[in-house]
């Protein structure tokens, strides 16, 4: 297991995704719970400060500052607490998150500004929204200084104030602004946004939550996969929604 690279600035872009690119937020109740646990995990006495964040359907982007050891403790608390909640609520078992979270050190103001924009533009690039004004990110906190937004207030000066912040975010940044390829976290543009795919899947399954498909008896699981394919979902979308491996989905759909 490789040793994490420390940042002189103490700031890191942290990314965590569902195991097998599985959906980790089924609805807004899940998202609210995650943000509650997130704020508790990065409380004042944790030694870790949350700067920016964004929740996608199958992964999370966080920009945080602190010592690596403190970050590891906070991330372990966040991931384990949320996974226990999610598994209980959705009657599933097994790992929710894929291995260790990824972290990229941030060293310069230019890199910091680019990463903040990258995090806030994730929903826009993925087709979840038509701008950065997305309810499950810190974009609004920067503008309104919500939730004791001292870090956001100070960082607005990096953009020349609120108007500069809006202008900087109004244009989609190129790949050079990204610390990790979009494709690695499934955040690229898709023909059917994940939120739409989730609704289609629920309708096709007739009351079975997509995340529960992987734990169904094999015959019922296979039939569910077939219904999802017939509903127009791609192999990759079915993999993410159900947690069933891509190879199994492809085999069942005859791809």
Q: Where are the regions that the model predicts?
A:
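Short Pro-Cys-Gly-centered "Cys-loop" motif that presents a nucleophilic cysteine in a tight turn
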Residues: 1-52, 65-255
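Short Gly/Ser/Thr- and Asp/Glu-enriched loop/turn motifs at secondary-structure junctions
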Residues: 55-59
């Amino acid at each position: 297991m490789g040793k994490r690279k420390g940042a002189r600035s103490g700031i890191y872009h942290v990314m965590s995704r569902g195991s097998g690119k599985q959906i980790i937020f089924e609805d807004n109740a899940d998202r609210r719970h995650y943000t509650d646990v997130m704020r508790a995990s990065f409380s004042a006495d944790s030694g870790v400060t949350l700067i920016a964040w964004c929740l996608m359907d199958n992964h999370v982007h966080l920009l945080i500052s602190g010592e690596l050891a403190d970050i590891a403790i906070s991330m372990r608390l966040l991931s384990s607490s949320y996974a226990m909640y999610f598994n209980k609520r959705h009657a599933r078992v097994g790992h929710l998150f894929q291995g260790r979270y990824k972290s990229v050190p941030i060293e310069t103001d230019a890199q910091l500004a680019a990463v903040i924009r990258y995090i806030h533009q994730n929903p826009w690039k993925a087709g979840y929204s038509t701008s950065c004004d997305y309810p499950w990110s810190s974009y609004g906190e920067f503008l309104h200084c919500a939730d004791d937004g001292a870090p956001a207030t100070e960082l607005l000066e990096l953009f020349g104030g609120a108007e500069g912040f809006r202008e900087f975010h109004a244009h989609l940044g190129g790949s050079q602004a990204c610390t990790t390829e979009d494709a690695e976290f499934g955040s690229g543009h898709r023909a059917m946004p994940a939120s739409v795919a989730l609704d289609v899947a629920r309708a096709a399954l007739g009351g079975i939550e997509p995340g529960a498909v992987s734990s169904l008896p094999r015959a019922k699981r296979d039939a569910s996969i077939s219904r999802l394919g017939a509903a127009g979902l791609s192999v990759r979308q079915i993999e993410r929604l159900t947690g069933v491996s891509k190879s199994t989905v492809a085999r069942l759909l005859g791809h």
